[in-house]
């Protein structure tokens, strides 16, 4: 690298530092003083279910007063308690109301009633990366790199706030109208200084240290990034099998095979991200995220332009207007039932 290029890189890294320091101030204000009860169920018209989970659903809703569309996550308090997800749910809301980044879905309102917790988020009509990836088969390397760069920046932001995301997968990445990513579902995200021990995540994306019940840190997110880049570029994940136990055996073995069409730069980056040895895994070394940002596979990436959303997206989802749901699957609809008595008031008092 020439002197001029090195100087440019140095000043970019300095301005990133300044940006993150300011971002942390903003985050901490909201983290310490979380917004509560900023809307009410009656203010929204419920339109259609966009997804379902073990303790709730996500619905497209329309704000009656403004006509704006949102995605409303509805969680059944009693089910959350039964599934021992109280802590995770409180984490999700507390984190979402405090963060602010171009590739993180925005929490617009949150509230609760006798039966449910509600998180009202920006509606991202392009649907999940998962469905586009399965339809197209696999993404070209430039296409995969465009998305990967946004995740790198997002993790750099989250990690600087001591947040581990822990649930990276194509199902949790929505594609917006401009073709950029919106990361959703902070159900497993956690603020951790140092190490944590909870087993959570999706089998194919779990880092070896989580499987081996070791204390782990934010390096698990960089491992998951390696899995995601592999899956985007190959069309299937690097470790798969019928049973989770077989997947886990493959993950901890430290052996990865690459499709012949992967470029040598891509294989090199993935070997450094899918690195079982934490003392060698990119993102976890003394240069931190810069080992990833300065890797040859990202040589053509203009990080600032990606952050500013100035790079032309490789793919724009088709959609026919603000309330269009054609990029989401259909689900059976269900009434939202609200009890006349308060359920689990104590457990969710801080929500």
From Swiss-Prot:
One of its GO terms (biological process) is signal transduction. Autophosphorylated. Phosphorylation is enhanced by vitamin K(2). Phosphorylated on threonine and serine residues. Phosphorylation on Thr-198 is required for full activity. Phosphorylated at Tyr-331 by activated receptor tyrosine kinases EGFR and PDGFR; this increases catalytic efficiency. Asn-3 is deaminated to Asp in more than 25% of the proteins, giving rise to 2 major isoelectric variants, called CB and CA respectively (0.4 pH unit change). Deamidation proceeds via the so-called beta-aspartyl shift mechanism and yields either 'D-Asp-2' (major) or 'D-isoAsp-2' (minor), in addition to L-isomers. Deamidation occurs after the addition of myristate. The Asn-3 form reaches a significantly larger nuclear/cytoplasmic ratio than the 'Asp-2' form. Its main location: cytoplasm. The modification Deamidated asparagine is found at residue 3. The modification Phosphotyrosine is found at residue 331. It is found in: Cytoplasm; Cell membrane; Membrane; Nucleus. It is a lipid-anchor. ATP binds at residues 50-58, 73, 122-128, 169-172. Belongs to the protein kinase superfamily. AGC Ser/Thr protein kinase family. cAMP subfamily. This is cAMP-dependent protein kinase catalytic subunit alpha. It comes from Sus scrofa. The gene is PRKACA.
